[in-house]
């Protein structure tokens, strides 16, 4: 269903729902609107709404739904329309606006006529008018683009420019003088602010004119106008650059002079200030070194060049005595293009590299002419400039941060030390907008063409779109400490924010510096959006900078975007701004991931022995949660205990409690750390060595350790043995008791078996203590080292210990399981007996009821009640017996699987021992025991227990490489002997070597041997044992001489002949 005004409907619904519903009316109103918006027929929608709203409104549902749909048709939820009365004030201001624009046009015409009265000597009147026509066309196109952009961002800009106190939205006032129809359309929004703007602008203009008229160099009599600004030009040692917002196109930036020319024609008093005269230097020489601070007119489209070329173009005077010399010209500056035009490397047309046409600047800077520099002009000494006077100068009439030079509204960042220069970071080319007749005229006059403007911007990873002031100071000026401390954030005067008292927050003394050159101070930053209005001062040392060098930027920003700054003397921040280009978020503080704690155990130490019992500890620690386990005398310490809670939160409550444990402030509560939680801060070499060493579990008494063991070799463990690194076999056995010792730091020689005496000591120690501990040992297997390190003599004792302890563990596990099974059987027996007794009792009561028919009703009711209870108990017992029988079956299966796993592990160990050439006697015994156990459990078929496929010359299944004694558990009737003929008795030994060394079994010394399968006669019962012994001897003898490869080939040969 279509809704005309959703907000009005929501507010109407909220008022309607408030008295009839307990839920939040606004939320429910949103829900109702969402229901009504569904695309359904009216009847279905009504039923659907009633169904959905029944939960909230209950009885009121039907009435509310009817009222809702009625209002949707009648639209009575819409507020009554009030007749809009035209306000007289906007009309008056609109008239005033028209007057201003009409007034401005004659003013511009008058200024043009005045310019025509004073033509320059080298220019004709026709050329001047031609140039003005071209400039006017360009300006019109320029402002069309500018206004088109600002139409989209008007609301965003108006919201912040007013608060930030920039230039009261320069684009709006500029739009008033440029587009009459557009201004009339939007005049209602801006009219209340117009009088303030006009008053401030006229005040600003008058102050500026006063300053300009009063300017006279100190060291010379008042010269003519041309001498005045030409001589002042040569004494300019530093530059200040203001960058236009990043979104402006190539032809949008304006100089201060242009800004004030455009907007000074009308003011609140309705009078026009006298027009400015043309700048003679600019007309004759093609540039003016005063730039936008010149009190004479440079026209609507002045020449723009970069200040970085000043040192090479104008020979500056030497610094006053006592000051360091300026850096050599051109340092850290890109090479400037020559006078001839040429294609630049960037995407835009124009000569040479430089900032792109999308971001241009206004910087009138002179070309070099080779004339000698004039005398140094020093201003009258003044007190140091404070930051408040620099920033708030516009709001204080009659004051100027830079006397006789800067317009009062120029908000300058504080100057920086000499050795901090700028780099040019834009890479797009830009071309001068002066071409055609004016350019050819300049070439004829011998004046150099305009240079390119280089735009200084912060790296893109610094602040995203936050582009602002970039100040370059190249004057040799000393630092004067500043005593100004900024107060809280003032949007009219944002202060420098830094992590400490940075050395850059120091200002210059007017008595010790030359007059600063404020060439090209434009208003391009004044009405950018607030993200583009942050002032950034980027400084770099005057040496070639690498990416990792310390680079400092001072940021003037609102409080919400402040960042700490590292000084040159301090370390870089965690994420330096010059780190990864293109990542705008990298200077933001990172967020720590929340650790998910799982520890539930607490260690309690220094408990008095009389208090270290379960009752006392439970009395205190049960206040904080459910205790799962309490161990007193933990790790054999009579003053320690271990408390385990159900959850980590409960343990945290206990450890963070301020209450004294057992009213004793000396008792300490700590988190219990398991062995695997210890930080593994080991290098890869240490980890490799740790994989090689033996983890052997010794007895609980520390005094039983031999004296030759270093104390560091003993480490107390509390956790059960866990899996060891990569190559060490997983340990299986009973959990380790607290207080057991582990030989964890055995020297390398002991581990690798180089020193047999030390190894024998260790093995002796293991033999002494390992048997009683019942713990298992890891198998020596390290694939990272050659097998030659291990000798069977050095490893015999530990291997014996391992095999013995493992079989002992298996027996203990089986014993425990048998005991558990026995207990289950006893319980089942008792339940069965109880069931039988209850059934007998039930039968007795039933017979009693049948016999005594004349029984009282009360007794009858009691007997019936008892019978009912007995029936319930009987059924319950039967269910329990059924479940116990089903549970007992899986336990048997589990036992089988464990036994099978143990059997497979033992076979794997045997393979490894055989491949490394170790003694396998103990392991074979253990394997035979496990096979018997497996046969008893039904894992292996009785009489088919040949699982040692690795020994001897196994056929078919998993043939191994080992050579050892055979344990025949399977009767194999395949023939294993070959009767041979065609040789003499003396050649028997050679024949055996021939069989073992070559595969040519049928030929021997160029003779063909007679070989056939040996078919033994069926022996009688009495001689069966003897024949088996003979067979074993034959096989063992042949195994001694046969190698692995021949064994495989022979098997293949045999299998082929067997198929025949």
Swiss-Prot record:
Residues that bear Omega-N-methylarginine: 455
Bias kind Acidic residues: ranges: 1024-1037, 1044-1053
C3H1-type zinc finger segments: 273-301
Biased composition (Polar residues): 387-402, 755-770
Phosphoserine, modified sites: 928, 1012, 1020
CDD domains: RRM_RBM27
UniProt keyword Hydrolase, yes or no: no
The RRM domain, residue ranges: 600-674
Pro residues bias locations: 319-356, 371-384
Gene3D superfamilies reported in the protein's UniProt record: 3.30.70.330, PWI domain (1.20.1390.10)
Annotated Gene Ontology cellular component terms: cytoplasm; nuclear speck
Start-end of Basic and acidic residues biased regions: 84-102, 124-143, 186-211
Skewed-composition ranges (Basic residues): 165-185
Sequence positions bearing Phosphothreonine: 447
Keywords: Coiled coil, Cytoplasm, Metal-binding, Methylation, Nucleus, Phosphoprotein, RNA-binding, Zinc, Zinc-finger
Renumbered residue ranges of the record's region Disordered: 80-143, 160-278, 319-416, 572-594, 754-775, 943-982, 1014-1060
Comment text on domains: The RRM domain mediates integration into cytospeckles.
Name of the protein in question: RNA-binding protein 27
Record gene name: Rbm27
